[in-house]
């Protein structure tokens, strides 16, 4: 169940309402304060545990600062890189796309929403973005193969993609893993600032 940005004070009455009609509820996701409070209230009704698991943080670009890398340049993905992008998606976030990785990569090509950082003719990193909706575009996914990490490529490419979003008259946002201090630090250097934390709470 997704509670979104529900005000924490409303979490209790919402949990009260669902406890009697949806006893099989296995989890809740949304704003951290609301989801955690919902979980505690659910425990009071149904017993069991309410365990906070995956946490993400929403960031908004407020003051843009460009980042650069020691080598390479950004460009859009090409049709010859559909399998490459699909393979990187498999390696970087295997649970999110399942068997639809190639179709997803083809869609990025069609929408021109996947960027590649290239060094000496070799693709070393990818950063995507969403088609703007209501003036907002979300940056991601971001993936660098292990052998090309710690060289500033992801930060530089994220910076370039973010700049393009802003140049198009849209706002840029992105999500990060709460436990990934490195990426949170890099995005802060670009000018992203936290807006809200979201978590999954497993009920059982």
Please place each PLM-identified region on the residue numbering:
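Recognition helices and adjacent regulatory flanks at domain boundaries
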Residues: 116-118, 129-132, 151-164, 171, ...
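Conserved acetyl-CoA-binding loop of GNAT-fold acetyltransferases
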Residues: 44-50, 188-197
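Acyl-donor-binding surface of acyltransferase catalytic domains
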Residues: 1-71, 201
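Conserved GNAT acetyl-CoA-binding A-motif
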Residues: 22-32, 165-176
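A conserved beta-strand-loop-helix scaffold within acyl/acetyltransferase catalytic domains
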Residues: 97-143
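Short amphipathic alpha-helix that is part of the acyltransferase structural core
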Residues: 64-97
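Conserved acetyl-CoA-binding loop-helix of GNAT-fold acetyltransferases
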Residues: 8-17, 140, 144-146, 150-167, ...
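Conserved beta-strand-loop-alpha-helix junction that forms the acyl-donor binding cleft
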Residues: 29-35, 174-184, 201-204
């Amino acid at each position: 169940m997704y509670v979104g940005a529900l005000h924490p004070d409303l979490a209790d009455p919402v949990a009260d309402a669902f406890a009697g009609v949806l006893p099989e509820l296995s989890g809740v996701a949304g704003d951290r304060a609301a989801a955690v409070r919902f979980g505690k209230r659910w425990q009071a009704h149904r017993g069991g545990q309410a365990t906070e698991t995956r946490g993400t943080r929403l960031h908004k670009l407020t003051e843009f600062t460009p980042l650069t890398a020691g080598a390479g340049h950004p460009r859009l993905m090409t049709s010859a890189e559909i399998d490459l992008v699909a393979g990187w998606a498999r390696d970087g976030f295997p649970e999110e796309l399942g068997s639809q990785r190639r179709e997803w990569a083809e869609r990025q090509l069609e929408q021109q929403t996947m960027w590649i950082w290239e060094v000496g003719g070799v693709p070393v990193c990818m950063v995507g973005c969403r088609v703007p909706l209501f003036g907002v575009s979300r940056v991601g996914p971001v993936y660098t193969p292990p052998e090309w990490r710690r060289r500033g490529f992801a930060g530089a490419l994220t910076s370039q993609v973010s700049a393009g979003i802003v140049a198009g008259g849209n706002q840029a946002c992105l999500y990060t893993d709460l436990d990934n201090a490195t990426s949170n630090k890099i995005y802060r250097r670009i000018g992203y600032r936290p807006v809200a934390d979201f978590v999954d709470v497993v009920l059982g």
